[in-house]
């Protein structure tokens, strides 16, 4: 088995990679910067029995996405899971977003999904799955999250259209939206308010706790299984029912 995770050396991406890291599995971890974190992630994956492959490459361009898949091809002829988790966080008000930076956010958070999927088609086939990691910012307005939120909304729409072309090939694609998970990206958005936000998130769920890594990685594992064959083009939130309150 083989899995490719963009943004796979930290946070949610790394947790998903580790969920699939078993003996005999090739785990491709894409990153852009921070080699120290990448090496640490590779060691963690290999401690679980899998083989880790680090790929340093920006996926925000068609050329970059193709280079990532070019690194996969010599190792395996089949990619079972493609997980696009790379994110460019820009915690600024929308009216202050620089157009160049906004375009980068769209490219990395959204159109990279299309670039990667197209590049991966030669090594994906019946039973392969694609995942896009989204967030509630793609559906609701979150303060200082406009650039990323708009990109997430675009990517969710792309997923629905990709279903029409991937489905006949036997490839499934879905979005998973974990909410309120303590990650570096979340702390970049909320800064010194992060702990307060996490505590409030837990209080707002009917069962009184926040989302932990096992909650969403278990969902991804299920969606990658044959049992989820008829789940296509969905955005599935993992938030403990946080937003059910009137």
What residue spans do the PLM features occupy?
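Catalytic loop of short-chain dehydrogenase/reductase
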Residues: 131-155, 159-168, 180-181
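Short C-terminal tail/terminal secondary-structure segment
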Residues: 140, 221, 232-246
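Alpha-helical segment proximal to the catalytic Tyr-Lys
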Residues: 122, 164-168, 229
